[in-house]
Regions:
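Short loop/turn segments that flank or connect secondary-structure elements
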Residues: 1-261
């Protein structure tokens, strides 16, 4: 299944569910180190952890890494800031390739380390949002691929262990929970025709808090969890409030802190 196409086009969850795998599921794949997965890829989305790891490795800021490798735009459905890796050059190659080799192999983005697996959060969509987010499950799919071979049988669990990816990835679950909650508020504001200037300030604040405000000389997770612990209560409050109260709260908040976000 092409999970990236599904996510871009907002596919039917029932279709996705047919392809979901758990930790004991098996798939056939053996990497031939051909490098195809590093070229002609326009589907790589960076998380804050990915950006931090690259910035830490090269002694750069988060903003520098984003400017050198990516574009940032509002997600079509989520309306959230999306950091999308942009291929470069005549070979349409990953900007992190140097002389044909991955320059961040030891800290590559999780989506690259997982390949050909994809990872999604899954929950019962018949439940209220808060109950959905309290009962998140991590599931996996095999992406459509045109490289490698089918000579090796792998379990999902073995594949994760081989590339040092935690089965119970605290960041992945917490990040998705925060992202989904904030997306709900962002969409509510857009649908209510929130004053454009206020929406822009809120969007930029989310982008800076979620993606930029990290000290790469310090560990990532304590900083991320501190940010999430501060932001999440406000997002919960905004998501539960009537829209006019949401707008009023944001106007008051930015009047106190200034609008130069």
């Amino acid at each position: 299944m092409d999970i990236h196409k599904y996510l871009r086009e907002g596919g039917n969850p029932d279709e996705l569910e047919q392809h979901l795998m758990d930790l004991d599921s098996t798939f056939r794949f053996k990497c031939r180190r051909c490098g195809k997965c590093c070229k002609n890829q326009d589907t790589i989305i960076f998380t804050p952890r990915d950006i931090y790891n690259i910035a830490h490795k090269f002694g750069k800021t988060m903003e520098q890494v984003i400017e050198e490798t990516s574009e940032v735009y509002p997600g079509r459905d989520s309306r959230m800031p999306i950091v999308h890796m942009v291929p470069r050059g005549p070979k349409n190659a990953c900007p992190l390739l140097v002389d044909g080799r991955c320059s961040v192999h030891d800290c590559k983005p999780t989506v690259c380390a997982l390949f050909p697996l994809g990872r999604v959060v899954w929950f019962d969509r018949t439940l209220p949002l808060e109950q959905q987010l309290d009962n998140i499950q991590v599931r996996y799919i095999v992406n459509d691929i045109d490289c490698g071979s089918a000579k090796r049988v792998n379990t999902v669990c073995e594949w994760l262990a081989r590339f040092g990816i935690a089965e119970d990835d605290e960041f992945f679950i917490r990040w998705n929970r925060l992202f989904i909650r904030t997306s709900s508020v962002m969409r509510k504001l857009e649908e209510a025709h929130c004053p454009p200037a206020l929406l822009v300030v809120f969007w930029r604040t989310v982008y800076k808090d979620f993606y930029l405000n990290y000290d790469t000389s310090k560990e990532f997770m304590p900083q991320f969890l501190s940010m999430a612990d501060q932001v999440e209560p406000l997002i919960r409050e905004l998501d539960a409030a009537p829209i006019q109260r949401v707008i009023q709260t944001l106007e008051e908040r930015y009047a106190k802190t200034g609008t130069d976000q």
